Each structure stands twice: as structure tokens, then as C-alpha cells.
């Protein structure tokens, strides 16, 4: 019995050791070669990191294609709508179609040609003046027509726009406007020719001219649009260019007739400004001297940065020269009078019987 018990205990301990070894082998993964392990790891990481793309979706390229298709459809629809709206015949007040020169063409050609003509005329309306004769004919007797025409810009010459948080946009009147109008109205036909729109400029002109010195008003639609500038074409004024003076703060405004213009510096709103008084004296001097062609005078000041300052310097120099001439003349007259009185004393005239 003792021997059998010893054998049984040995068998039981052997079974325990065998089961432990089997469990250890099952729990421990089999060893692999280093290259094979790295390859498996990289495959696993690639699968873990890569986007899980679902079937049927194409990513950003699909959205881009859809956007392009929608833009193309909208553009085509807009083009067809424009051709349909502007390509029809104009109608009269009764709703009847007005025939034009395109009626004999095919319908599609009619639509396209009318649309092209509409936009061409619209562009021409922006670029060209509204009329080749912007002003009516000069007044005839017994009415009075001033001998010269003065063309004035509004913004920068007569007014200065200012903006504040409390009041918004306001226009400040330049000092000397009343004096300018009063002194030049008998000599010049005053015309406001501004690059502002009529809706903006009309009430401003009413505020600066309550007494009605301004004869005519011309706005942006009367200018000629060239290279981004609104140019005032003197040849469209229906006046003699030899007697037209343009005052503006931009030389581009009278680029077609550079010797008809006086370019002033834009007014910055300074209340002590006296430019309009100097301008009045300058233009009054031209008119009172009866200059036949103002371009011969304005040509001398075309290259000056400040034409009015140059005029004042020349005027001051001429006054000094005139004073010297008068002083010399007065001195010579006094000498002649002295010699004449001495001669009469020496050789008295014989009395007539």
C-alpha cells in the first residue's frame, strides 16, 4: 500500500507539471523572424491609419464637379434670360411692337443683334456726352450775353465734403463764393460742370447759389469718360473755345483742351482760404482787358503748380514797374515844366494886338 501511494503521488505531480507547460506554451505566441514581424506590423498600422472609404463616395473632386456644373447652368440660364429680355422689339405706349432693322433676320439672330445693340448703346452713353451741343445757343439782342464763359467744378473748387459720426456727410462752402459770383456774373456766363451725378449736385448748387448767378448746370452724364477720368469736352459746349475758361482741381478734366483750363489745388476745408478771391481778380483782369483768345493767356500758366500765385507775382512785379515808370515820367515832366517856365521868362511871348 505504501508503494502504491508513492507511485500515485508521483503520477499526480507529473500531470501538474505537464499541464503548466502546456498552458505556458498556449499563452506565449510563437516566435517569428524579425523581417516577417515588421512586415505584419506595418500592414496592421496601414490598415489602422488609412481612411475607411465607403463605396459610392468620391471625395472633394465630386463636390467640385457638382459646383462647376451648377455654375455653368446658372451662367447659361442667365445668358438666355438676358437675350430674351433685351432681344425683343421695343413697344410703344399701347403695347404694340415697334419694327426695327432686325425684323428680317431669323428670330435667334434678331435676339442676339438687339441685345448687342442695347449694351453697345449703353456703353456709348456712359463714355460719350449726352449731346454734341450741351448748351443752348447764345442769347441774342435785346438780351445780354456775357462775352466769356466760365466753367466751374463743384467738388474741390467750391465745396469740400466732410464726414463725422454725428452728422454723416456734409459739404462745406468755400469762402469767397458770393464775391466770385457777384464780380464775374456781368463778365462771364457761369456754368457748373461737375463730375458728380445730378441727384447729388443739384441740391448743392441750389445751396451755393441762392441768387441765381449760375446760368447752366451740367453733370456727369455730360462728360466724356476716358482712361478712368470724366473729361469735360469744351467743343461740346456750343460756345467759342477762345472765350471759355475751365476751372477744376484735376488737369485730367480738361485734357482735351489743356490751354482752356486753370488747375487749382483741391480745397481742404480751411476757413481762411482766399483762392476764390484771387481767382476772381485773375478772371476779372482777363475780361476787363478784352482778351480775344483766353488760351494765349492761360498757356503761360499751364505749367505752373499754382497759377494764381504765379499771376499775383507777375501782377506785383508789373505794378512795381508801372510805379517806377510813373515816377520817372513825373520827374521828367517836372523838369520840362521848370525849363518851360524859365524859357518863358527869358523870352516872353509877344502879346497879340
Swiss-Prot record:
GO terms for molecular function: cysteine-type endopeptidase activator activity; interleukin-2 receptor binding; phosphoprotein phosphatase activity; protein serine/threonine phosphatase activity; protein tyrosine phosphatase activity; ribonucleoprotein complex binding; RNA binding. InterPro entries: FCP1_dom, HAD-like_sf, HAD_sf, TIM50. Changing residue 114 to Q: In MGCA9; uncertain significance. Gene3D superfamilies: HAD superfamily/HAD-like (3.40.50.1000). It is a single-pass membrane protein. This is Mitochondrial import inner membrane translocase subunit TIM50. Widely expressed. Expressed at higher level in brain, kidney and liver (at protein level). Belongs to the TIM50 family. The chain crosses the membrane at residues 66-86. Residues 49-60 have a biased composition (Low complexity). Residues 45-65 are mitochondrial matrix.
